[in-house]
């Protein structure tokens, strides 16, 4: 028996363990959708799947609670599939290898899926438990949140109805979120005709790894290094001083994760090899100094490899490296009226160059529409000047905070009564689905909260066990004390 099954509350953790056994990376949700539909039938609640792939449950009010405001419980079913470079794991087939480490639940070499698996299993536990007190409940478990909030965007009017939305996708217990940033994807592409490499040159594979990475909204203001940006600094110098040519570039693999690793293959004249190898060591030390106390495990190495036949033409190489080097990345500015809360940022998430094609993906976030457009226009200019075709997609507005929210007032009072302290009220610099769902179901009073998770979207992701009990107890109390209509 897995040790997770003995954790409290057991009815939550048993469902989480079941979830870890079912592959559910974004874009491959058939198995989890079937599982959730079957679960709904087994526990006797109305359940169905809509055209966007979302799963919906409906549970009637407890007798005597019919006069309470109707609540929508909301979470997303997909997870970010990230693994360490040397971890053997197929996210479309393999279960997540979970284990308990003190007060934390972790995975071995992969993302854990507590984002947003903990929200899903809290919903499952509530749907299953016939002893709870609550008003009319609807559960909305959305599809493909991590890759573009496609389930939320595909939700049609009339599919779900309610007066209160409790989003269970926040990651710090004791915090209530009343607003979030909007976002927009930018993709720059280019096709080019490759040139032959110089047969006298030497090929080197240069690898950067060991960075912390993280969620490109929540952790963008923490000062974590971006692997693509560091590699651009290296490339800029070896092109200028060592006659380096570029064969390929692979950095990052998720639009909403700060890239932790990057690998390029370059060619240089034989006379420059030792200088380049020495410079690799110098770069590692410089970056360790620059990111002291933030990035403790930077590894920057180079090794000789077989000489490829083809490479990126010189002019294209220069344009691409210059654009990546100049591309705005990280925090643009903080919200002037809310201390320490990022307003606008962007993440140079993915760079793929090789075999005659280049593709670069950036995700920009902002709680202010004008600043989101400003930042993405600057990024678009960088890549347009490099001769790339640039497309924007998936734009969504933020969720405007309402400090006078009735459910906010009720939940603050409930939390204080339960735990003897007042929860923090915040705005999050990440894309929650609340704003999108709120546009489909007008008039919703919305709050987002959840248990404590650390390092989501990375193999270091972990979930704090004691916080899960507090989160679940608070959720049950919120449902029991939902305001009357």
Where does each model-flagged region fall?
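Substrate-recognition/cap regions that form aromatic- and gly/pro-loop-enriched pockets
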Residues: 341-430
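Active-site metal-coordination/substrate-binding segment of hydrolases
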Residues: 65-147, 152-163, 203, 318, ...
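Zn-dependent metallopeptidase/amidohydrolase metal-coordination segment
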Residues: 12, 336, 343-358, 422-474
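Active-site-adjacent substrate-binding region
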Residues: 219, 226-228, 233-249, 401-444
């Amino acid at each position: 028996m897995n040790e997770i099954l003995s954790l409290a509350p057991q009815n939550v953790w048993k469902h989480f363990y079941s979830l870890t056994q079912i592959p559910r990376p974004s874009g491959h949700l058939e198995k989890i959708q079937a599982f959730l539909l079957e679960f709904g039938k087994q526990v006797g609640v109305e359940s169905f799947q809509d055209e966007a792939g979302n799963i919906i449950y409906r549970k009637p009010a407890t007798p005597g609670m019919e006069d309470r405001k109707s609540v929508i419980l909301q979470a997303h079913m997909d997870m970010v599939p990230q693994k360490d470079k040397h971890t053997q794991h197929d996210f479309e087939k393999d279960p997540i290898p979970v284990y308990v480490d003190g007060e934390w639940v972790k995975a071995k070499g992969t993302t854990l899926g507590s984002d947003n698996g903990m929200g899903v299993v809290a919903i499952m536990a509530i749907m299953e438990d016939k002893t709870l007190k609550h008003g009319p409940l609807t559960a909305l478990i959305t599809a493909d949140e991590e890759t573009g909030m496609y389930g939320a965007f595909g939700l049609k009017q009339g599919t779900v109805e309610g007066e209160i939305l409790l989003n269970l996708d926040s990651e710090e217990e004791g915090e209530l979120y009343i607003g979030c940033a909007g976002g927009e994807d930018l993709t720059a592409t280019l096709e080019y005709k490759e040139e032959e490499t110089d047969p006298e040159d030497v090929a080197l594979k240069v690898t950067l790894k060991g960075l912390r990475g993280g969620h490109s909204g929540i952790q963008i203001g923490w000062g974590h290094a971006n692997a693509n940006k560091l590699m651009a600094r290296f490339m800029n110098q070896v092109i200028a001083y060592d006659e380096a040519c570029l064969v390929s570039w692979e950095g990052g693999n998720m639009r909403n994760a700060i890239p932790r690793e990057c690998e390029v293959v370059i060619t240089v004249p034989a006379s420059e090899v030792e200088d380049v190898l020495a410079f690799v060591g110098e770069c590692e030390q410089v970056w360790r100094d620059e990111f002291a106390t933030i990035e403790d495990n930077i590894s920057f190495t180079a090794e000789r490899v077989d000489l490829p036949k083809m490479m990126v033409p010189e002019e294209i190489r220069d344009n691409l490296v210059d654009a990546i080097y100049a591309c705005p990345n990280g925090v643009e500015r903080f919200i002037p009226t809310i201390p320490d809360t990022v307003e606008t940022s962007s993440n140079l998430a993915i760079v793929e160059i090789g075999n005659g094609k280049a593709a670069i993906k950036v995700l920009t976030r902002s709680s202010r529409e004008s600043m989101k457009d400003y930042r993405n226009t600057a990024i678009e200019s960088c890549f347009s000047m490099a001769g790339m075709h640039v497309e924007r997609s998936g734009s969504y507005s933020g969720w405007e905070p309402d400090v006078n929210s009735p459910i906010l007032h009720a939940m603050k009072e409930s939390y204080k009564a339960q735990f003897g302290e007042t929860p923090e009220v915040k705005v999050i610099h990440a894309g929650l689905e609340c704003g999108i769902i709120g546009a489909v179901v007008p008039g919703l009073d919305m709050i987002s909260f959840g248990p404590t998770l650390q390092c989501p979207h990375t193999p270091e992701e972990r979930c704090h066990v004691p916080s899960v009990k507090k989160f679940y107890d608070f959720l049950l109390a919120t449902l029991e004390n939902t305001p009357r209509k």
